[in-house]
Amino acid sequence: MENTLREFQMHELEMLKALSDKLESAGIRFYLIGGSSIGALRHQGFIPWDDDVDVAIMRRDFKRAEEMLCQLKAPFLYDPVEKHVIPDAPLGHIYLNDGRPLEEAPRIDVFAIDNVPDSSLCEKFQNLCSMIYHVCVLRRPAENRGKFKKLFTSAICNLCPKFLLDFLQKLAYKGVTAWQNKSTKYVSNIYGVSGKNEKVPAEFYGVPRYVAFEDVLMPIPEKAEEYNTHIYGDYMKYPPEEQRVPSHFGKVVK
């Protein structure tokens, strides 16, 4: 068991290298996003207090990527989106499966990036489908998504029997991903923590750009500076000291 956050991060770095090897062997692009992208640009590695890794894959490649990640060898374990071992959001996770509770294990969050339709009406339809898909995958109301979304998803969860949730899940998935093979101006990490701010010009992701991350080169969005500024503002500025804390590492060392 780790005694320091740095040891925790080093486990995640090994997991990231394994992910990179799997995806690149299949010709699948991925990007470090979120705090991992900031870490790459500001620290050339992990943000010193960060305790997970955020990775994004374009929706058109996502199912194939999940198939590859399910082949990771022990002690690494991939938890697919629709398996939802830990029901937090419809995204995939890679864990260090070493016997501890998975909620406390080193992990990589794996997000799908969806094309956003250019039509505002179609975008609203996609947003509706994303809410329905969320509750159908997790089988519980959406958290931290606003009062309306919580009420709406609570109604679906409480009123629909399992067979109907299964049907709605497949239908909603088709609605969310209907534009995956089309060229659109914008893309979004729909289930990212920044909500509507996750919608960015498609060119921000572009062709992955490799930069130093600890002792390896890892891909970030082509226009990572613009991407991070759009979502986080002045991302090169350190947050207040009281905010420089890990999300769940403390559970491990207590």
What are these regions (language model features)?
Residues 120-125:
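A short secondary-structure junction signal
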Residues 43, 50, 57, 130, ...:
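Solvent-exposed, non-transmembrane amphipathic alpha-helical segments
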Residues 1-24, 66-118, 138-143, 150-233, ...:
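Conserved catalytic core of two-metal-ion nucleotidyltransferases
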Residues 20-53, 57, 66, 203, ...:
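Active-site nucleotide-donor binding segment shared across nucleotidyl transfer reactions
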Residues 128-144:
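Short, cationic low-complexity segments
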Residues 63:
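Glycine-centered loop/turn positions within well-structured domains
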